[in-house]
């Protein structure tokens, strides 16, 4: 099933007929494959690892699939399609990336939902693109087109992240935050409670949903002998975490994982401020799956140590998978669950 944005793109397939096409920031569907009905070849860069995995079975010579914050090649295309990002700060980066991978006078196509800020696109396009033209408006989505009028600037990573100091119970750390990765530029309340109650860990530890690497940097600062895996589903978060490790002179294994599917499965500890906060049924199911996977990936005697909004129903699934529920600390908003695998 294609998303509304993808459906609107496909009904404008004459825009990229017989073109070489690059798709940036595509959604969780098979749009890149569907484009081949009109395009001569398609390359697609996913910033969400789950979206990349959905497409992976369809990889072919004329359908090149990538995951990360940039393409591994310098290839240029007739058209670049950008899905307007939910994190608006990410949009200028995607436009720069599109510009660098367009042929001279190449075509930019931007699609997005009305409620996602796409209407403001004409004001957001950098001046190396011509004025945006509204090509279609349907299914609560808009398609804009534009043309590259001069060479886009080189992408220098240092232009696309902010660096700031963070005071933690483990000492001061430097955080590097790529555009599109949420940051309050201070220690959020949940992570603060987690780090104030940081236990002594040992061996191989997993930081699940590592984000920009706040927990990882604090943990390794206090306990440098740990072997730490940092996983996230978001390419910009993984790049942020890598930069944070470098800035603090720390070392960790940083890689993409859809849940825990790509992890080693043999950990002495799992630590996390899980990215499940809204309390919806779907979120509850994801949280339940997370606890189940954490138990399966822990060695006997391993420590499960997370912080969660106190209204989220973690207790039942922790009891089911760990035999008991141990709340080691709490305040009026958060609880620290700290359980040993028996």
Curated annotation (Swiss-Prot):
Alphabetical UniProt keywords: Cytoplasm, Methyltransferase, rRNA processing, S-adenosyl-L-methionine, Transferase
Subcellular localization: Cytoplasm
Enzyme's top EC category: transferase
EC number: 2.1.1.172
Keyword Translocase annotated: no
Gene Ontology molecular functions: 16S rRNA (guanine(1207)-N(2))-methyltransferase activity; nucleic acid binding
GO cellular component: cytoplasm
UniProt xrefs under InterPro entries: DNA_methylase_N6_adenine_CS (IPR002052), Mtase_sm_N (IPR013675), rRNA_ssu_MeTfrase_C (IPR023543), RsmC/RlmG (IPR046977), SAM-dependent_MTases_sf (IPR029063), Small_mtfrase_dom (IPR007848)
Alphabetical list of Pfam families matching this protein: MTS (PF05175), MTS_N (PF08468)
Primary residence: cytoplasm
Disulphide linkage map: none
Catalytic activity, as annotated: guanosine(1207) in 16S rRNA + S-adenosyl-L-methionine = N(2)-methylguanosine(1207) in 16S rRNA + S-adenosyl-L-homocysteine + H(+)
Function: Specifically methylates the guanine in position 1207 of 16S rRNA in the 30S particle.
Family per record: Belongs to the methyltransferase superfamily. RsmC family.
Alphabetical list of PANTHER family matching this protein: RIBOSOMAL RNA SMALL SUBUNIT METHYLTRANSFERASE C
Subunit structure comment from the entry: Monomer.
Protein name, UniProt field: Ribosomal RNA small subunit methyltransferase C
Gene: rsmC
């Amino acid at each position: 099933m294609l998303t509304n944005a993808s459906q609107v793109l496909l009904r404008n397939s004459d825009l990229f007929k017989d073109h070489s096409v690059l798709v940036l920031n595509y959604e969780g569907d098979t749009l890149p494959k569907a484009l081949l009905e009109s395009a001569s070849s398609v390359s697609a860069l996913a910033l969400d690892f789950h979206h990349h995995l959905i497409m992976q079975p369809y990889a072919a010579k004329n359908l090149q699939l990538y995951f990360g914050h940039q393409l591994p090649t310098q290839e240029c295309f007739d058209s670049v399609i950008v899905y307007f990002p939910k994190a608006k700060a990410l949009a200028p980066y995607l436009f720069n990336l599109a510009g660098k991978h367009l042929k001279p006078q190449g075509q930019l196509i931007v699609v997005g939902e009305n409620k996602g800020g796409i209407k403001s696109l004409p004001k957001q396009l950098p001046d190396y693109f011509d004025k945006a033209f509204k090509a279609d408006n349907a299914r609560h989505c808009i398609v804009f087109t534009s043309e590259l009028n001069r060479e886009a600037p080189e992408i220098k990573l240092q232009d696309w992240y902010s660096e700031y100091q963070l005071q933690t119970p483990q000492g001061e750390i430097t955080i590097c935050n790529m555009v599109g990765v949420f940051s309050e530029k201070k220690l959020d309340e949940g992570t603060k409670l987690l780090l104030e109650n940081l236990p002594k860990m040992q061996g191989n530890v997993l930081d699940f949903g590592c984000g920009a690497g706040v927990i990882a940097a604090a943990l390794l600062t206090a306990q440098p002998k740990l072997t730490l895996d940092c996983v996230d589903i978001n390419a910009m978060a993984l790049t942020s975490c890598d930069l944070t490790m470098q800035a603090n002179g720390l070392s960790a294994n940083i890689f993409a994982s859809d849940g825990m599917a790509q992890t080693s499965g043999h950990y002495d500890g799992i630590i996390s401020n899980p990215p499940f906060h809204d309390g919806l049924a779907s979120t509850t199911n994801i949280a339940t799956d997370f606890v189940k996977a954490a138990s399966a990936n822990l060695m006997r005697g391993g420590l499960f140590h997370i912080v969660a909004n106190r209204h989220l129903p973690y207790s039942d699934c922790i009891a089911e998978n760990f035999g008991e529920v141990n709340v080691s600390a709490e305040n009026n908003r958060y609880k620290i669950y700290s359980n040993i695998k028996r």
